[in-house]
A protein has these predicted regions:
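Short, Lys/Arg-enriched, disordered terminal segments
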Residues: 1-2, 217
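ABC family nucleotide-binding domain
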Residues: 2-210
């Protein structure tokens, strides 16, 4: 279970102070598929970054079951992310100098995992014949499937997605959503998706809406 308490993030000081997130309290149960929606600047990506331990809150806490992310130093937080959270971003963020396979295996090497299920991932994500190619040689949909494989290589319980279909055509976007739903339904992965697309949000089991850094619903 993921829980936040009074989660707050501000930038700047004095008259230039901007509140990106303002006292957000949410609970996401294991195995949920949740959409986070809201207008541009509402705090969606800020919330996702805090949930993923990619940024530190100004105030408040993020809990993964009984683990409080705010008590972890940078080293412990990096280790926790590596083992427990997979990230999928809008622009794929594959390393251009590495093949798809090398990109997928990169987190496993960081975690020093000797055994992985990369072969099964390639088959499930239909990229078996593309793993030796570099990102520039892949379509947008293939790059995103490689990014999803990378997110899953350490078998995390939680997958955080920031506009995962935002840079894809309609068909590729639908394929990515079907993959995420399958992971949620068949492997009980907790999937959290930031999106501005109402169709994407409607496919999730629950919607959290933000407005000006606060819960709108």
């Amino acid at each position: 279970m993921i829980k936040t308490q009074n989660l707050t993030k501000t930038y700047g000081k004095g008259e230039g102070k901007v509140t990106a997130l303002d006292g957000v309290d949410i609970t996401i149960r294991d195995g949920e598929m949740v959409a986070i929606i809201g207008k541009s600047g509402s705090g969606k990506s800020t919330l996702l970054n805090l949930l993923g331990g990619l940024d530190k809150a100004t105030d408040g806490k993020v809990f993964y079951n009984d683990k409080d992310l705010s008590t972890m130093n940078d080293s412990k937080l990096s280790e926790f992310r590596l083992k427990n959270i997979g990230f999928v971003f809008q622009f794929f963020d594959l390393i251009p100098e590495l093949t798809a396979e090398e990109n997928v295996m990169f987190p496993a090497k960081l975690a020093k995992k000797k055994e992985t299920s990369e072969g099964e991932l390639y088959t499930a994500l239909d990229i078996n014949d593309r793993v030796k190619h570099y990102p520039a040689e892949l379509s947008g949909g293939q790059q995103q499937r490689a990014a999803i494989a990378r997110a899953l290589i350490n078998d995390p319980d939680v997958i955080l997605c920031d506009e995962p279909t935002g840079n894809l055509d309609k068909r590729s976007g639908a394929e990515v959503m079907n993959l995420l739903k399958k992971l949620n339904q068949e492997q009980n992965k907790t999937v959290i998706i930031v999106t501005h697309d109402s169709d994407i949000a409607s496919q999730c089991s629950r919607i959290i809406e933000l407005s000006d850094g606060r819960l709108a619903n």
